[in-house]
């Protein structure tokens, strides 16, 4: 058994490490968030619905194309159900304020197992990052709902990364992006018509 001795130098080093960690955490970039409100929740949920509709339509298109088999097919079938359930849940929460789903065209991104997997990773990462970026602006009730969805989104990205032989969780934390960044990323896909 290794014995640890508490010396003045270990206490000082520990205190310096703690102070440095606190300074680094204080420097963590934060977006300015307006006061949380039900109205802001609705705006965030409207955008989350676009992300979920995009993902849901992508998996449906991939299944319709019929280019998948084995583990990728199983992944697409399971995740298609999840994404549809997420979109339905948000649509129900928004009620009559829910926007109509945009039209999407996924072109060659669903034409082969490789292009499907590459696109799935990008879309799942986008969704996860968008939820993480929106979280600070949500009221506690909406945040709890979003947490139940984002935890599943994290499983999706880990699963598809594992299928293609990538590290399932390559970073100790997931990135967060602003709504503007997420909107730009969605437009950059070229999938929205």
Predicted stretch roles:
Residues 2-6, 13-193:
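All-alpha RGS (Regulator of G-protein Signaling) helical domain and cognate RGS-like helical scaffolds
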């Amino acid at each position: 058994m290794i014995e640890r001795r508490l010396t003045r130098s270990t206490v000082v080093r520990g205190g310096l490490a703690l102070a440095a960690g606190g300074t680094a955490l204080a420097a963590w970039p934060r977006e300015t968030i307006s006061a949380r409100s039900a109205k802001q929740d609705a705006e965030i949920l409207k955008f989350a619905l676009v992300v979920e509709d995009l993902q849901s339509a992508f998996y449906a298109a991939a299944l319709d194309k019929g280019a998948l088999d084995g583990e990728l097919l199983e992944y697409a079938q399971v995740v298609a159900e999840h994404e549809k359930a997420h979109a339905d849940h948000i649509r129900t929460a928004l009620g009559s304020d829910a926007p109509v789903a945009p039209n999407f065209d996924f072109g060659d991104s669903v034409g082969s197992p490789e292009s499907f997997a590459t696109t799935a990773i990008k879309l799942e990462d986008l969704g996860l990052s968008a939820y993480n970026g929106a979280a600070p602006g949500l009221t506690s009730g909406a945040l709890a709902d979003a947490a139940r969805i984002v935890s599943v989104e994290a499983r999706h990205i880990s699963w598809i990364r594992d299928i293609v032989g990538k590290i399932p969780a390559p970073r100790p934390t997931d990135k967060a992006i602003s709504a503007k960044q997420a909107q730009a990323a969605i437009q950059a896909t070229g999938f929205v018509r």
